[in-house]
Structure formats: C-alpha cells, structure tokens
From Swiss-Prot:
InterPro entries: ArnD, Glyco_hydro/deAcase_b/a-brl, NODB_dom, Polysacc_deacetylase_ArnD
Keyword Chloroplast belongs to the record: no
Name used for this protein in its record: Probable 4-deoxy-4-formamido-L-arabinose-phosphoundecaprenol deformylase ArnD
Any one biological process term the GO annotation gives: lipopolysaccharide biosynthetic process
Gene assigned in the entry: arnD
Native source species: Salmonella agona (strain SL483)
Amino acid sequence: MTKVGLRIDVDTLRGTREGVPRLLATLHRHGVQASFFFSVGPDNMGRHLWRLIRPRFLWKMLRSNAASLYGWDILLAGTAWPGKNIGNANAGIIRETATYHETGLHAWDHHAWQTHSGHWSIRQLEEDIARGITALEAIIGKPVTCSAAAGWRADGRVVRAKEPFNLRYNSDCRGTTLFRPLLMPGQTGTPQIPVTLPTWDEVIGPAVQAQSFNTWIISRMLQNKGTPVYTIHAEVEGIVHQPLFEDLLVRARDAGITFCPLGELLPTSPESLPLGQIVRGHIPGREGWLGCQQAASAS
C-alpha cells in the first residue's frame, strides 16, 4: 500500500463557494481525508492578468485553457472592483471543512503573497501570516496548526517568519521528503512537508493530455521514492474537473494508493527527520520562482 498526502489549496472565492462543497462530497463518498489550505482574505486573483506579458505565464494560461478551467469570475476578481473577503463570505463552508478534515492557512491575500512576499521584510511576513491565522481561527473556532505558502513562494525568511506561530508543520516548498529546516547552526524550525508531485496545470499540454492525466499521475505516485504529496485545487478539481478527480480516487484505490492528510505523514518523533533548507528555484510548468527543498549541507 502506498500512502500519499493529499493537499487541497483553496485560492479564491469561487473555489471556496463552489469547489470545496463538491470536494467534501466527493471525498466523503470515497472515505478519503485530506488537508485543506484556505485563503481567507480578499480575492484579488484577477490581478495576475498583468503577468500575461510574461511568455512563460502566457503559455501556461494557453496550455491549460485557463478561461475554461477557472472561469472569468476568478480571472477578473479584484481587477475592476475590490476583491471580496473569502472568509467572511464562506465561513460556514470553511467551518464544515474543519469539522472533517485537517484545515490550515494558505494565505490572507493569495495574490499579494504570491506577488510581494519575495521582498517583504520579516515583520511584514509575520503580520500577514498573523492576519490570516487570526481570521481562520475566528472562523473554525480552534487553533490553526498548519500552513502552506501560496504559490510555494517561500524561502528562509518565510520559514523564520512562521516560527512564532507554533505550527505543527508547514508545506511551503517542492521537494522529495519531509525535513526540518535549518534556521542557524544548532537550531531547526517547524517540520516541512514538501509537495513532491506535479499539479494538473503544470503538465497538461503537449506532453500529457487530459484524458491520460490520471494514468500518468498514478504512475508518478507509485514511482515516487520519497514521501509522495499531491496537490489539487478547489478551483480545478472541485469544479470543472471534479469528475476527473473522482475517477482518480477510484483508480488510485485500485492501484493500492491510500490518500491521507499531510499531518499523518509526520513521524512520532519529528527530531528524526533530516535537516534541510528552502531555497528559491524553478520547476517545469510553473512561471516564476518558488521554494525548493535543498540539503542543509549544500552551499
């Protein structure tokens, strides 16, 4: 049996309102639990449209047929009008999710984090994280114990900025296996659970066709040599491609794969995890930099 951590990112108002309820129903039908990470502040995701001037981002949008995939309400959110507050508008849905699934913070403002966190000060990072955690805790009525950086925009500064919040783990980067981030000699931070597998929008195109994606990703899960962690998005697998995701759950079960919340991947003694660090890097299919796992001994 292969255990795969299932991470569900919720980036937008529509993803929360429409995608999450469908995902909750789908997961319930198949007896699967996952980790949901919510954006709880303003939905300004439409402001990413200016990135269309970047060839790699434009190619990604064309390759994934973004207008059909996400819908124009997502692609234009926060452009011609102020972004609506996701948490306030969908508190009941988020609260229901937290009743049945591990629930953590994705971002206060997903667009702001993805666009500006790379040059924010530690204080600005801490203030933004605190704002999101405070809002999410007010909604779910219990402490937030985990987080996942929006767009995997994380580096050593983000690791340090999250330390005051006493989280059980973070999932801020791409990598191969769980690790303890090295803060300074002799001091380590909150365990990291990297995402190890590609997302739908990173691979769909000439190399992998939509109809063969499930076969392809299951093969990758079974071949994964580290600790497999897979990310889906409420805006994609919860709406347009919900039938495809349900088919994935069936095929994965038949292939001997069991999905679980990320927290279940943590060992009893996190001190046994190897040391590592998060550095800025790039991966195929994703525009811009993102946090990548690196061995602590690497220069």
